[in-house]
């Protein structure tokens, strides 16, 4: 059945800058915000925007992500016609060919796209935190009679060299694109969200695939090629909350942003819900002795200590006399009796030992607490005790 617009969601990235958080799971599956995973935001945006056909392209450590997405029920994407389809690399007569770049991942799934014969293809990244109505962007794309529309956001000039930067004319038509320029001419950064006219995208994916010198990436190869060919590329200005949670510090910051009273993301907005898989946990329990302030405390938590400006995921336990400040405690983790935790991300199922202390040496830094970190910390404590 023909679709006006379908989405291709790139979710195969490793996210190596998140260190141990992505050792066994893909970056889009990393927990966020007390009950979500990062990919929930993009999938929820699709549902809320009326995009009912989504191909999710996976590659790195896909097991948990595949299980989590399932048939898409949590996001109302369990449709007979369309819905969500997980698209890992697959074997053909010449063998298994891994995805070699963002553009190549979409190219290898041309047959999936063709079965819906769409007019437009929305290409998304599954590893950013934001709310966006893609229908507004599509209307803009059509009104501009564009071949390609790229969503952009203004970033501080001092940070512009970290992004793909668009230089536009007064009509917002893109006249120049530079990937991480040393001397940026603009502060309009690409958000990694593209709308293509499908016939044109198909043509240029085939051209790019035939080029042995290409890295097969949208930002590095396909977009510059379209600019050289004088195609109509427009920038779509986005003004809401958007966060690239590619580092431990930025992931912590995004979680802390949720605790601001007037935060732009607003998880409690009934008009734009962020959907997730229900963890099926019992209600939270906060003991009479506990003190909790400015925090998100999810289902299944047991809090007997002090929690200030922190995010607790499902199944977290905070022991008696324990203190947790400005921290993210991920699913199943525990802070034992009398322990102190500040400015930390505690990974799933980790246990902070009784009466221990976790805080960064640099006041502006963030500690990532993993099983390996705890092992090293315990060994150092034992050596000090022996001395």
Curated annotation (Swiss-Prot):
Its EC number is 2.7.7.27. Pathway: Glycan biosynthesis; glycogen biosynthesis. InterPro entries: ADP-Glc_PPase, ADP_Glu_pyroP_CS, GlgC_bac, GlmU/GlgC-like_hexapep, NTP_transferase_dom, Nucleotide-diphossugar_trans, Trimer_LpxA-like_sf. One of its GO terms (biological process) is glycogen biosynthetic process. Keywords: ATP-binding, Carbohydrate metabolism, Glycogen biosynthesis, Glycogen metabolism, Nucleotide-binding, Nucleotidyltransferase, Transferase. Involved in the biosynthesis of ADP-glucose, a building block required for the elongation reactions to produce glycogen. Catalyzes the reaction between ATP and alpha-D-glucose 1-phosphate (G1P) to produce pyrophosphate and ADP-Glc. Belongs to the bacterial/plant glucose-1-phosphate adenylyltransferase family. This is Glucose-1-phosphate adenylyltransferase. It comes from Geobacillus thermodenitrificans (strain NG80-2). The lineage of its organism: Bacteria, Bacillati, Bacillota, Bacilli, Bacillales.
């Amino acid at each position: 059945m023909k679709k006006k617009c379908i989405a291709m969601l790139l979710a195969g990235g490793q996210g190596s800058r998140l260190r141990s958080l992505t050792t066994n799971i893909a970056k889009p599956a990393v927990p966020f915000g007390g009950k979500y995973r990062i990919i929930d935001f993009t999938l929820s945006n699709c549902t809320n925007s009326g995009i009912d056909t989504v191909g999710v392209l996976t590659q790195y450590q896909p097991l948990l992500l595949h299980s989590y997405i399932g048939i898409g029920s949590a996001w109302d994407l369990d449709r007979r016609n369309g819905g969500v389809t997980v698209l890992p690399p697959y074997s053909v007569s010449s063998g298994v060919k891994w995805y070699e770049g963002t553009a190549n991942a979409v190219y290898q799934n041309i047959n999936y796209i063709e079965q819906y014969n769409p007019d437009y293809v929305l290409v998304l990244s599954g590893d950013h935190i934001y709310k966006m109505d893609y229908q507004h962007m599509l209307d803009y794309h059509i009104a501009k009679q564009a071949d390609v529309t790229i969503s952009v956001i203004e970033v501080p000039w001092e940070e512009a060299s970290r992004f793909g930067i668009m230089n536009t004319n007064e009509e917002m038509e893109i006249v120049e694109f530079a990937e991480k320029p040393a001397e940026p001419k603009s502060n309009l950064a690409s958000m990694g969200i593209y709308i293509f006219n499908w016939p044109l995208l198909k043509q240029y994916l085939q051209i790019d695939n035939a080029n042995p010198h290409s890295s097969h990436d949208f930002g590095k190869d396909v977009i510059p090629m379209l600019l050289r060919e004088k195609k109509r590329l427009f920038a779509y200005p986005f003004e809401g909350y958007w966060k690239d949670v590619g580092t431990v510090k930025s992931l912590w910051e995004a979680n802390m942003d949720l605790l601001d009273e007037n935060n732009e993301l607003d998880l409690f907005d009934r008009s734009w819900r962020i959907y997730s898989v229900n963890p099926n946990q019992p209600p939270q329990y906060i003991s009479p002795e506990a003190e909790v302030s400015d925090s998100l405390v999810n289902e299944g938590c047991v809090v007997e200590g002090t929690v200030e400006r922190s995010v607790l995921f499902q199944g977290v336990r905070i022991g008696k006399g324990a203190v947790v400040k400005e921290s993210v405690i991920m699913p199943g983790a525990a802070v034992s009796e009398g322990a102190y935790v500040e400015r930390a991300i505690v990974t799933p199922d980790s246990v902070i030992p009784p009466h221990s202390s976790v805080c960064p040496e640099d006041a502006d830094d963030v500690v990532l607490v993993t099983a390996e970190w705890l092992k090293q910390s315990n060994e150092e404590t034992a050596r000090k005790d022996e001395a």
